[in-house]
Each structure stands twice: as C-alpha cells, then as structure tokens.
Amino acid sequence: MPNKDLRDWVTDLKKNNQLQIVSGADREEEIGAIVDIQMRQMTNPAVLFDDIPGYPKGYRVLANILTSVPRINLALDEPIDKSEVELVDYWRTYMKNQPTHDPIEVNGGPLLDNVYEGKDIDITKIPTPRWHEHDGGYFIGTACMVVMKDPDSGWINYGAYRVQSQGPSTASLMTSKGKHGDIIRNKYHEKGEPCPVAVVVGMHPALFMVAGLEMPYGKNEYDCAGGLIGEGIEIINMPKTGLPVPANAEIAFEGFIHPDDRIDEGPLGEWTGYYAGGATTQPAIRLETFMHRDNPILL
C-alpha cells in the first residue's frame, strides 16, 4: 500500500536509514547551513529538525527530501534499490501514459486538528527558516503546492510557487509570468475580482513531484498525483474559498489576492547556490483561514 501522507513517508525513511534527526538548530541560518552541507555529502539523508529554539517541541522542519534515488523510490512505493535507469524508465512510462485517479472528497482529516480564523491567524507560529544569509525574509512555501481555480472553466490547478511569510495573516506569492497560477490570477483581476488561493505545506511527496511538472492547461494535478501513487488523493474543501486541499497535509492556509495589492518580496537563495535577483513587489495573500496538524512538519 502506498504511503498515505508525509508522515508515512518519514516513517519509511527512518526504517531505511534515509533520515537524520537534528535537535536544537536555530531557524536563523543554522537550519539552512546544515541542509546546504548535507546536500553536498556522498551520503545525504533527509534531515528532520526538532527542538527549534523559540518554538514548541514537535514543531518540525523536514529538508533535503528528494535528493536521492532511494527516497524518490520510497515516495513512489517502489523498491528502494531500484536503479537510476529504472527510475527514469518509470517516469518516462508515467509521462507517456499519464494514468489518473480522481481525488476522493472526505469530511475531515488530521489537517483540521487546529483551525484558526480572523485575528487568531498566525502563520509565524510555524518555525519557518531563513534559509540563506541574504534572504529577504522567511519563506514558508518552497516545497509547497498553491491551489487555484480557473474562474471561467472551474478547473482546479495546483503548482509549486514561492510563498513568503509576511506577518501573522499575510503572505506573498511569486509566480513567473505565463505560469498557470499567473494566468488564473490575472483572469480574476481582469474582472476586478479577488483571486482565491490556498497554500499547502507538508504533503505527500508525490503531490510535490506533480506540482513541479509541466502539465497542460486544464489538466487536474490531483488526478495525476493519484495516478502516480495508484489511488485517489483524499481532499477536503477549505471553508472560505472552497478550494480542495489534501486532508492529510501538515499545514494549509487560504485567502484572497486583491487587484493591485502587492508587497515587497524576496530575494531567496535558489537551490543552485545563487540569487536570481533582488527584492521585487509581488501579490499579497490576505489570509482568512489557517490550519495545521498537531505537531506540524514544515516541508
């Protein structure tokens, strides 16, 4: 049976010596520095940070997740010793056939362990790291999925875009021009309407893999992620926007991007080791709901 969520996968990593647990690292550059060093080692397990100063024990950060073939194999419920060539063949077959499984709407899930609205929203309670010395802030969404709905067709799209924490109830969203998220947001704003958006952090790694693929406009990524793991993704609808999010995710928040509402964003050091540019102004998300599991894991 495939892993149901991120925690199942983390358990598999631990069983297969693919996980290192680090206690006491500070979110101010220490976590980022450890991850940078770890990525350059010959053996580089995923790293789970706990006991982060200033935050409750159990509020964790997971990094270096998909930088090895064995961990990708485990995420896909494949034998851990499948070779790189076999993994490439697996992906080629998947992309050629693109099997799908419809998502399964459920009434609840562990994501609803803690739900906050209005003045109770505070995404800064999550120990979001400053990954690099010259970063412009704390980026809660680097390995995340951003969910939107086309206002004309009703198509649900999700993609991997950059999200920066801008305070307790505000985030910013950076989408490159021409990406599906950018197209959808512009459709709302051309009508003079706010764009609803949901951000999910800490989900099954297969969902993140699909978020980074170049799917055709109109293709439902939830269907594709279900096809990748062999069963439908369990989803719940966010209370304000109605956007679907994985019921077993660690963290999610929703809100609206209003026309001409922008905020300073970035920069963020990229995984390649460079900064792509300086700070820019990007669309602001004004949050209306924030939820997370007990003892959440930031991915």
Tell me the role of every PLM-derived stretch.
Residues 1-284, 288-299:
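Extended, highly charged
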